[in-house]
């Protein structure tokens, strides 16, 4: 039986083995609606009830799983070599704060990343740019008084989606019309703050007008056919540069990717979550693994 997290509640009769793939994924935890449970933990208990074996598979184990394995509570099996003996990609950290201070940044892109993108395109290789924020800008702010539009339900800043010309709450899904002026001071100088995948797509198309660019996030993959089309076009070489959120890290392998750029990587460390450092590492490692040739740039 191949199933999602709710499959642990099926009426098994003779269970012998449970395999939890990518056990570190936070999507195994159901918070809303009830019942609230973690499918990985439920699978371990289920297997114990039937006297079955449990296999937790991942390249980036969760902290608790790694502790259980290293302390001897779980058995540990390691793969010492990569498939086809492919070498690990080179990771190049770039200090964008220093580049901003010297005014050398081109929007969200460092000179080094742009150089490697140019080289990859010249060599008919592909590029993946990872930004774990969808939309055009994570926040709109009045440049006169500092007013920021927030969701009336969640009290969080609203994300601006340029294609829809609206503000959206990414927590409850509520949408708002983009105001023409600030309701606090009636000023008209409303500025975008930050950048999401939609903004990255716009900027890349300006910087590399000859390249075929695609974006893969929740907004562009509402249907299964749209998701499959984006992946197929990239695999067939119809797309040169793929811009995406964490979707691009989910078990995808591409043969002709030579550059993966992780934009503003350190922002993932600042999420209001006690697992933010753990999840940042897991995401970066999974995105880097997408490159099966040679990772050149990592911001």
PLM features: what roles do these ranges have?
Residues 1-296:
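Inter-lobe coupling/hinge segments of SF2-like helicase ATPases
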């Amino acid at each position: 039986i191949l199933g999602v997290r709710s499959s642990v509640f099926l009426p098994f009769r003779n269970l012998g083995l449970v395999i939890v793939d990518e056990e570190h994924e936070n999507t195994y935890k159901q918070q809303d609606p009830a019942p609230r449970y973690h499918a990985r933990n439920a699978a371990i208990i289920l297997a114990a009830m039937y006297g079955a074996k449990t296999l937790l598979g991942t390249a980036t184990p969760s902290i608790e799983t790694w502790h259980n394995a290293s302390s001897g509570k779980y058995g540990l099996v390691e793969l010492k070599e990569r498939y086809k003996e492919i070498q690990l990609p080179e990771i190049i950290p770039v200090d964008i704060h220093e580049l901003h201070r010297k005014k050398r940044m081109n929007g969200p892109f460092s000179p080094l990343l742009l150089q490697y993108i140019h080289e990859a395109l010249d060599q008919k290789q592909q590029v993946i740019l990872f930004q774990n924020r969808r939309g055009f800008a994570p926040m709109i702010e009045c440049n006169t008084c500092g007013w920021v539009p927030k969701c009336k339900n969640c009290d969080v800043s609203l994300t601006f989606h340029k294609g829809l010309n609206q503000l959206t709450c990414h927590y409850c899904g509520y949408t708002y019309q983009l105001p023409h002026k600030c309701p606090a001071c009636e000023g008209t100088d409303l500025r975008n703050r930050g950048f999401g995948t939609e903004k990255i797509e716009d900027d890349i198309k300006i910087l590399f007008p000859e390249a075929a660019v695609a974006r893969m996030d929740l907004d562009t993959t509402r249907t299964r056919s749209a998701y499959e089309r984006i992946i197929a076009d990239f695999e067939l070489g119809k797309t040169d540069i793929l811009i995406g959120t964490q979707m691009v890290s989910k078990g995808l392998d591409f043969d002709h990717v030579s550059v993966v750029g992780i934009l503003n990587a350190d922002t993932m460390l600042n999420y209001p979550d006690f697992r933010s450092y753990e999840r940042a590492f897991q995401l970066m490692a999974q995105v880097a693994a997408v490159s099966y040739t040679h990772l050149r740039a990592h911001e």
